[in-house]
Amino acid sequence: MGKQKKTRKYATMKRMLSLRDQRLKEKDRLKPKKKEKKDPSALKEREVPQHPSCLFFQYNTQLGPPYHILVDTNFINFSIKAKLDLVQSMMDCLYAKCIPCITDCVMAEIEKLGQKYRVALRIAKDPRFERLPCTHKGTYADDCLVQRVTQHKCYIVATVDRDLKRRIRKIPGVPIMYISNHRYNIERMPDDYGAPRF
């Protein structure tokens, strides 16, 4: 038996005229886009983000005792691992009264971690912690912390996460608290606060 030839049936595909075809009337024809020539002498407009008046260059005048410290999920976990009391260690680091703050997103993140991190959840529910409500959608804590710190420059961010630290370093005037050598340390503080470095 021979092989059957597959012939293309005529007019199966609808033939369309291009919108630039010469056979179309002038009014129906698509006009070619003209490229706008850029004037090299014209001033270029740029959107520069406005910095708040509380900043004097990198110096943040809004920071002062009692310090409000935004706590990240992994900061609580690493503190438990290093056997550090959160509030007491913060006070030892800054030599002043500290109010640890925890957002709804961080709380939800700790709850999602499950039974293994129940100690972290118990610490997060401590009455000494100030609870900050979140109004945005989603429960990704890193974005929440970065957004909150960008809006209000009165916080210190406590985290051990490298990516979050990198993101916060781009925001001027926001100090970062981290754990090193089984003690809390602070980075980018306006005055010489913080535990001595070894």
Curated annotation (Swiss-Prot):
Composition skew (Basic and acidic residues), residue ranges: 37-47
InterPro entries in UniProt: Fcf1/Utp23, Fcf1_PIN, PIN-like_dom_sf, PIN_dom
Main location: nucleus
A Pfam family assignment: Fcf1
SUPFAM superfamilies listed in its UniProt record: PIN domain-like
Superkingdom in the source lineage: Eukaryota
GO biological process: endonucleolytic cleavage in 5'-ETS of tricistronic rRNA transcript (SSU-rRNA, 5.8S rRNA, LSU-rRNA); endonucleolytic cleavage in ITS1 to separate SSU-rRNA from 5.8S rRNA and LSU-rRNA from tricistronic rRNA transcript (SSU-rRNA, 5.8S rRNA, LSU-rRNA); ribosomal small subunit biogenesis
One GO cellular component term: nucleolus
Keywords attached to this entry: Nucleus, Ribosome biogenesis, rRNA processing
Keyword Nucleus: yes
GO molecular function term, any single one: RNA binding
Residue span of region Disordered: 22-47
Identification of the protein by name: rRNA-processing protein FCF1 homolog
Native organism: Homo sapiens (Human)
Gene: FCF1
